[in-house]
Regions:
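Short hinge/gating elements
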Residues: 49-53, 106, 111, 168, ...
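Canonical P-loop GTPase G-domain recognition
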Residues: 242, 248-305
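Long, well-ordered amphipathic alpha-helical subdomains in the mid-to-C-terminal portions
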Residues: 64-65, 283, 294-372
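Alpha-helical scaffold elements adjacent to nucleotide-binding pockets in ATP/GTP-utilizing enzyme cores
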Residues: 147, 184, 209, 213, ...
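Flexible active-site lid/hinge loop adjacent to a nucleotide/diphosphate
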Residues: 225-254
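Non-catalytic terminal/linker segments enriched in charged/polar, low-complexity residues
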Residues: 1-95, 99, 343, 364, ...
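Nucleotide-state-sensitive switch-loop elements of NTP-binding domains
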Residues: 48-111, 115, 120-206, 213-220, ...
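Short beta-strand/turn micro-motifs at beta-sheet edges
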Residues: 152-153, 229-234, 269-273
Length: 376
């Protein structure tokens, strides 16, 4: 405070009663975190179904990504638009007469799945195909899914104009993730991608989901992984149309060749397939690219067979029927758990079960009964 005037700050920096020097201020723009600024920006309005379709069918991957985001959304308004886009995409693909190749890919840990997809995918696009890489990862809501990491490792495919990589949708249950992935397949096919890779993350329950939306199922194995045949479930081998022994390079060539022979013999022990295709085992290297042409050749041989004998079409029809029932199951489950009355009741019932006051099946029965009587 100035001793002479009692003002602060002093009007003159030359005031003898103070040693303070007050400089004139410089006007500064308000400091705003760019992230917060962008967060509050007005979100772009939804396009019309016709605009989405025009972008998708012209191969515009930006519009395709926006449409897939609607498919993955749980907002009712988004789902309504998404269902119309899916129906329009199905109609477009049917009219075009294009028969795509949906290839499910799974593998044991350490088989180098993302490296294989990078190498094999690049080889496929070099042959004039357009490739979409999708994933089914029910853990993606917690872990964000390994394909997010895979996408950063698939540098060549990411920069390939004939390739499109989409991370797994984040939805807590396997059923929700699988349904959204299947719908994404439909959009990608309408966008002109004639080869679709559907990747599973690890070897587990998601194989059945991938198999239910794939035409061809490829299992990646390592030589010596889990004592060879003991390291893989019989059911997954039975689903496989081909086994590829990866990392067949360097000092591992001989071991990979021995593993190939072992798996080839094992595949012949399974009953004949409905498609009449005889599953085979091959070796491959993502480093030397050895074996990749042979794998593609065998896959194309498979599609020639099943398109010729009608199995391709009948399997697609059976898959459509399967997903009709899966969609009903998913919708009923969501309707139950998202009901506000049930949301409140279920907490009390859960507590009663945990405290041992009520048996689980009785709690479930009472909750379902209350749910059925809500509209009465």
């Amino acid at each position: 405070m100035s001793a002479t005037t009692g003002e602060w700050p002093p009007k003159s920096h030359e005031n003898p009663d103070t040693a303070l020097v007050v400089n004139e201020g410089v006007e500064q723009p308000p400091i705003i975190n760019p992230y917060i600024k962008n967060f509050f920006k007005k979100k772009p309005a939804l396009l019309s179904v016709e605009e989405y379709m025009a972008g998708i069918t012209s191969g515009n991957t930006t519009i395709l990504s926006q449409a897939i985001t609607l498919v993955e959304s749980n907002l009712p308004a988004h789902r309504d638009v998404a269902q119309k886009i899916i129906a329009a995409c199905q109609e477009h693909t049917m009219k075009s007469g294009i028969q795509t190749m949906r290839i499910g890919i799974t593998g044991v840990p350490g088989a180098g799945k993302s490296t294989f997809i990078e190498a094999f995918g690049s080889f496929i696009t070099s042959k004039g195909h357009k490739l979409a890489v999708l994933a089914i990862d029910p853990s993606s809501e917690k872990s964000k899914g390994s394909i997010l990491g895979d996408k950063t490792r698939m540098e060549t495919l990411c920069n390939d104009p004939n390739a499109f990589i989409r991370p797994s949708p984040s939805a807590g249950s396997l059923g929700g993730v699988a349904r959204k992935t299947r719908e994404t397949v439909i959009l990608c096919e309408a966008a002109g991608f004639d080869v679709i890779f559907i990747e599973t993350v690890g070897v587990g329950q998601s194989e059945t989901a991938v198999h239910s939306m794939s035409d061809f199922f490829l299992l990646l194995m390592l030589s010596g992984a889990g004592d060879d045949l003991q390291g893989i479930k019989r059911g997954i081998m039975e689903m496989s149309d081909m086994i590829a022994i990866t990392k067949a390079d360097g000092n591992n060539v001989e071991k990979a060749s021995m593993a190939r022979a072992l798996y080839a013999n094992a595949l012949h022990l399974f009953p004949p397939t409905e498609s009449t295709w005889v599953p085979t085992a091959l070796t491959s290297s993502s480093v030397t690219k050895e074996g990749l042409p042979e794998i593609l050749e065998k896959i194309e041989e498979y599609f020639t067979l099943v398109k010729g004998n009608g199995y391709y079409q009948s399997k697609r029809r059976q898959q459509a029927k399967f997903w009709m029932y899966e969609s009903i199951n998913e919708a009923l489950k969501n309707s139950f758990y998202e009901n506000p009355v049930i949301e409140k009741l279920i907490v009390d019932y859960e507590g009663a079960v945990l405290d041992g006051k009520l048996e689980s099946f009785m709690a479930a029965g009472e909750l379902l009964e209350k749910y059925r009587n809500l509209d009465k």
